[in-house]
């Protein structure tokens, strides 16, 4: 009996020690900061220099419509895998388009695909991160899909080949879709040097390095360039 009691005591002590280590590794409020910034999309345009007969066209930059900024996701690229809470998001099928075309969710989240059109749609994906086929369903119906792995999932309609959307799935909470002005906020980011990425569904991504410190938000801005048309 004494031997059994000692074993129980040893196991209990080990469990308490392990719990203490786990608690100690959880970041406190003092170990967290935030990242704020703005995303713009620069479109190359051609402008005339001067009014001379010999004036030549020169490249310039204009900003894309604000609606395009809703197709951007900003995230901490080197973020550690972290326990996350599943979300519920929605991509509607409207006028033979996915609305919105881009959503960002945590692992385990469900994305619903309501059909607002007076025709059938068939949502599917062949992405490695998540392969699925929701089958055909009519107006007024909705079908959902759980996304259980991190990564990029390209979504299409099997009936209308011009329809496409993207689901970005993260195993950490440090990501955001900018608002219509391009502004974003990433709260609760661990302190230190990080790689911050701005991703656009068609323009790809760009990454900058940023140090997050306590006491004040770290700020960063992105301008995503659109390739010039020949």
Which residue stretches match the model-derived regions?
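Bacterial N-terminal signal peptides that target proteins for export
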Residues: 1-14
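Extracytoplasmic copper-binding redox domains, predominantly the cupredoxin/blue-copper superfamily
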Residues: 27-230
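C-terminal segment of classical bacterial N-terminal signal peptides
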Residues: 18-27
């Amino acid at each position: 009996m004494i031997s059994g009691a000692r074993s129980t005591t040893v196991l209990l002590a080990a469990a308490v020690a392990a719990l203490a280590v786990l608690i100690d590794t959880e970041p406190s409020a003092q170990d967290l900061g935030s990242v704020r910034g703005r995303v713009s999309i620069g479109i190359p345009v051609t402008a005339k220099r001067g009014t001379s007969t010999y004036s030549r066209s020169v490249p310039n930059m204009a900003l894309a419509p604000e609606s395009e900024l809703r197709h951007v996701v900003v995230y901490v690229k080197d973020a550690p895998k972290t326990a996350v809470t599943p979300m519920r998001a929605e991509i509607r099928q409207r006028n033979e388009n996915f609305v919105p075309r881009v959503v960002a969710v945590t692992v385990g989240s469900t994305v619903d695909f309501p059909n607002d059109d007076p025709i059938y749609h068939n949502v599917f994906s062949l992405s490695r991160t998540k392969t699925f086929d929701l089958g055909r369903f009519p107006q007024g119906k909705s079908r959902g899909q759980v996304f259980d792995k991190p990564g990029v999932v390209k979504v299409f309609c099997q009936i209308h080949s011009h329809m496409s959307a993207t689901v970005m799935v993260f195993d950490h909470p440090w990501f955001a879709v900018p608002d219509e002005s391009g502004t974003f906020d990433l709260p609760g980011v661990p302190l230190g040097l990080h790689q911050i990425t701005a991703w656009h569904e068609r323009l790809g991504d760009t990454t900058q390095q940023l140090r997050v410190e306590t006491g004040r938000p770290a700020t960063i801005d992105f301008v995503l360039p659109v390739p010039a048309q020949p």
